[in-house]
Regions:
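Short amphipathic alpha-helix used as the core "switch/output" element in two-component signaling
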Residues: 34, 56-68
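Conserved acidic carboxylate
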Residues: 3
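Acidic, metal-coordinating helix/loop segments flanking the phosphotransfer/catalytic sites
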Residues: 25-43
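Active-site residues of response regulator receiver
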Residues: 47, 76
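As written
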Residues: 55, 88-94
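Two-component/phosphorelay signaling modules centered on CheY-like receiver
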Residues: 6-24
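Acidic catalytic/metal-coordinating carboxylates
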Residues: 28, 54-57
Length: 125
């Protein structure tokens, strides 16, 4: 998970670990990219508003430098259609607005997102 807000990261981490997932949290875009490159996680949950770069820039870097990167789900406070379209056009398998989903909702969808990523799909729900 690439999320700079400790309380939000902790909320998701607690639920995901409870459900059996191993979670690593990176608090900046740079640390997030390094973590993905070094650990090859099954899925990346990506915030857009990060202290050093935007989540979109992280996704672009993943696409350019790690073409076989794991599937990416964007979790953002921004729900504008143009933002959602941009995220999906950059290859995110899903774009979720934080206020509209719970950590349990996210946890229940992880197997689907991983499967979509393995098939090479993007922007599917």
């Amino acid at each position: 998970m690439i999320e700079d807000d400790p309380s939000i990261a902790d909320m998701y981490r607690v639920q995901l670990e409870h459900d059996g997932y191993r979670v690593t949290v990176a608090t900046t875009a740079e640390l997030g990219f390094i973590t993905v490159a070094e650990n090859s996680p099954d899925l990346v949950l990506l915030d857009l508003l990060l202290p050093d770069r935007s989540g979109f820039e992280v996704l672009i870097s993943l696409n350019e430098r790690l073409p076989n990167h794991p599937p990416v789900v964007i979790l953002s406070n921004y729900g504008e259609p143009s933002m959602i379209d941009r995220g999906r056009s950059l290859g995110a398998v899903e774009y979720l607005v934080k206020s509209r989903v719970t950590p349990a909702d996210i946890s229940s969808q992880i197997p689907t997102w991983i499967a979509v990523g393995r098939r090479g799909g993007q922007g599917e729900s």
